[in-house]
Curated annotation (Swiss-Prot):
It is a peripheral membrane protein. SUPFAM superfamilies: Epsilon subunit of F1F0-ATP synthase N-terminal domain. This is ATP synthase epsilon chain. The lineage of its organism: Bacteria, Bacillati, Cyanobacteriota, Cyanophyceae, Synechococcales. One of its GO terms (cellular component) is plasma membrane-derived thylakoid membrane. Residues 116-125 have a biased composition (Basic and acidic residues).
């Protein structure tokens, strides 16, 4: 048995194929999906989706938040943005992660606008997801 996984962003279909297993970054923690999983809808956090293909290899997709629906061995993930780990440049992702960390550290050392800090934390989470997806 297998699952049909679709990862859809507003501007493109990022992934559409059969897989053996999916691990989703839900807002309440990592969620493993295998064939026969109960139907559900869950919020997706910024993070890395991991999928195991029929050949046993694991691949990663960086997700930028959204929702996932599981129904009858179909997993549909609707996200704000997504990127296949194998299409991300490792050096660029690591550089962006370090820059986002530095920007957040600078803001946390200052008193001031919490909206700027929230944006910096979100940027850091997105950069971390991209960096982790390429490294997996």
């Amino acid at each position: 048995m297998s699952l049909t996984l679709r990862v859809l962003a507003p501007d493109k279909s990022v992934f559409d194929d059969t897989v053996e297993e999916v691990i989703l970054p839900s807002t309440t923690g990592l969620l493993g999906i295998l064939p026969g999983h109960i139907s559900m809808v869950t919020a997706i956090d910024i993070g890395v989706l991991k999928l195991r293909s029929s050949n046993g290899n694991w691949d990663s997709i960086a997700l930028m938040g959204g929702f996932a629906e599981v129904e009858s061995d179909d997993v549909t993930v609707l996200v704000n943005a997504a990127e296949l780990g194998k299409s991300i440049d490792k050096a660029t992702a690591e550089k962006e992660f370090e820059q986002a960390k530095a920007a957040l550290n600078k803001l946390e050392d200052q008193a001031g606008n919490s909206a700027d800090k929230l944006k910096a934390k979100e940027s850091l989470n997105k950069a971390r997801a991209r960096s982790q997806a390429v490294g997996e």
